[in-house]
Amino acid sequence: MIPKSTCFIVEVVYECEIWPINVIENSFISLDLGLNNFVTAIDNQSKQPFIINGRAIKSINQFYNKLKANYQSKAKISNNKHFTKRLAKLSLMREFKISNFMHKASDLIIKCCIKHKIASVII
């Protein structure tokens, strides 16, 4: 268990069988990281590029900043504090959402690499 400011996180570790993957030598995928387009990727096997939209992260951060400013102003007026439990919970929820987005994006890239038997990833 990992204690956080407002909750506990339980991490489960388990072993699984790793299957060998046949890859094509000299095959690669190139990733271009950005803001509006979080990842733009193209490989030399399918030559079909794909884009992972990054506007979701911008939206999460914009909403977080809006609520944070509101809660900070209320906390400063009412009890002259800069950080409260509500702000801690808000920060934790933002962290969870961004972590979930990153996990889904990396999973999509890995599935593409397995599907097209990619040997190298270039960032």
Model-derived segments and spans:
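Metal-dependent phosphodiester-processing active-site neighborhood
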Residues: 1-123
